[in-house]
Swiss-Prot record:
NDH is composed of at least 16 different subunits, 5 of which are encoded in the nucleus. Its main location: plastid. Coiled coil: none annotated. The keyword Repeat does not apply. It is found in: Plastid, Chloroplast thylakoid membrane. NDH shuttles electrons from NAD(P)H:plastoquinone, via FMN and iron-sulfur (Fe-S) centers, to quinones in the photosynthetic chain and possibly in a chloroplast respiratory chain. The immediate electron acceptor for the enzyme in this species is believed to be plastoquinone. Couples the redox reaction to proton translocation, and thus conserves the redox energy in a proton gradient. Belongs to the complex I subunit 1 family. GO terms for cellular component: chloroplast thylakoid membrane. This is NAD(P)H-quinone oxidoreductase subunit 1, chloroplastic.
Length: 365
């Protein structure tokens, strides 16, 4: 059988074009993910700098000032230092669990950002179960902490891992019930739909005013999830040296450091999305898509998306002042006080709040 030369050339060019299209498709798929990771990295650097400056102001001392203008590059300098430090392994520990633990803590928190809408249609994955996917993913992080504590073969590390697991279980249930109340009010579990449900009445339509009890419980539970003071028992210095982080050094210790700030940022972003109206301007009957005419005007779409991202970030970083100042205001709880607060107070109150929300929705039908 004789094949024409032109046919062979056509087949080769078609296969080459197909492979190029596949490469372009992969690149186009990676662009938003890499953009999100870059944005998160910058966001964490800003949070670390803000916390150090606010903490210095509260304690009436001078914060970081030499690494870059106003000390903005101090976190980057600390990260670079940890990157070049030696990774030490405990001699009798489980090296596999010891190495996997920090990665699970970081990856599970990073995946939570995929369902956060930073602007109108500016979300990596707009899912019908977005908020509950976040809760499911965030519940994986304590497994990594427990693995780190167990793999270290150290009594302080293991006790810190057990505390982290117990604390996470105690406060995830009230947090989930608060999110369920928001879903009932918005008639959706999509993060985009929840933001749009708050846009009609502007500032007065925020879920903060419709769910004040849920907001307080969500805030307390998110502080406990992030292991911020007064809920930092898994790594209490006076009791457990550094908890599950005791045996870590170098980049692995840096991963735990990054994971804690990733968790703090994602919690604040979800507060902005669920309770503070997300990307919307706080003016009644004016939403970002309608104001900038998204459907017709392409320039307005770009400008509106940028404005939505800025509004979301402003709300997030303004809210971040509360957990940062709380760190230097309240004393650490005992373990029994922490568990009593979660099981005996927050859980019944969040159940009552869910019952009230369900009743109001039924009567409004």
């Amino acid at each position: 059988m004789i094949i024409d030369t032109t046919t062979v050339q056509a087949i080769n060019s078609f296969s080459r074009l197909k492979s190029l299209n596949e490469v372009y498709g992969i690149i186009w798929m990676l662009v938003p993910i890499l953009t999100l990771v870059l944005g998160i990295t910058i966001g964490i650097l800003v949070i670390v700098w803000l916390e150090r400056e606010i903490s210095a102001g509260i304690q009436q001392r001078i914060g970081p000032e030499y690494a870059g203008p106003f000390g903005v590059l101090q976190a980057l300098a600390d990260g670079t230092k940890l990157l070049f430090k030696e990774n030490l392994f405990p001699s009798r520990g489980d090296t596999r669990l010891f190495s996997i633990g920090p990665s699970i803590a970081v990856i599970s928190t990073l995946l939570s950002y995929s369902v956060i809408p930073f602007g109108y249609h500016f979300v990596l994955a707009d899912l019908n179960i977005g908020v509950f996917l976040w809760i499911a993913i965030s519940s994986i992080a304590p497994i990594g902490l427990l693995m780190s504590g167990y793999g270290s073969n150290n009594k302080y590390s293991f006790l810190g891992g057990l505390r982290a697991a117990a604390q996470s279980i105690s406060y995830e249930i009230p947090l989930t019930l608060c999110v369920l109340s928001i879903s009932l009010l918005s008639n959706s579990s999509s993060t985009v739909d929840i933001v749009e449900a708050q846009s009609k009445y502007g500032f007065g339509g925020w879920n903060l005013w419709r769910q004040p009890i849920g907001f307080i419980i969500f805030f307390i539970s998110s502080l406990a999830e992030c292991e911020r003071l007064p809920f930092d028992l898994p790594e209490a210095e006076e009791e457990l040296v550094a908890g599950y982080q005791t045996e870590y050094s170098g980049i692995k210790f840096g991963l735990f450091y990054v994971a804690s700030y990733l968790n703090l940022l994602v919690s604040s972003l979800f507060v902005a999305v669920l309770y503070l109206g997300g990307w919307n301007i706080s003016i009644p009957y004016i939403s970002v898509p309608e104001f900038f005419d998204f459907e017709i005007n392409k320039v307005g779409r770009v400008f509106g998306t940028t404005m939505g991202i800025l509004i979301t970030l402003v709300k997030t970083y303004l809210f971040l002042f509360i957990p940062i100042t709380t760190r230097w205001t309240l004393p650490r709880l005992r373990m029994d006080q922490l568990l009593n607060l979660g099981w005996k107070f927050l859980l019944p109150i969040s159940l009552g709040n869910l019952l009230l929300t369900t009743s109001s929705q039924l009567f409004s039908l």
